[in-house]
Amino acid sequence: EFVPGYDANGNKVGYVTTVAQPGYAGDITFILGVTLDGKIAGVRVTNQAETPGLGAKVAGIEWQDHWIGKDSSYEFNKSVDAFAGATISPTAVYTGLIRALKAYETGVSK
């Protein structure tokens, strides 16, 4: 479910949804903000049990913020999007992001 988001003046600026995607050690749950034109406005991991120092890096603010501005056409780039020794967790987040963005395109933005 996508919930609309508004600025201080009451103008709709995008949508937010919660995504759960299987990772290495269970579901990785995150909140995704999407702009009206279908780009990522923000990502925040809210729950994960990935390996500390490896997959758990998906909860890092800098890594989460690197998704801002990307859309459903973005292709996973292992050298940019993954961590040494951990590809399952970042790939899971990417998969969840793309799945949610495509759902936005087919359901909300129409």
PLM feature spans:
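Flexible, solvent-exposed loop/hinge segments and secondary-structure transition points
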Residues: 1-110
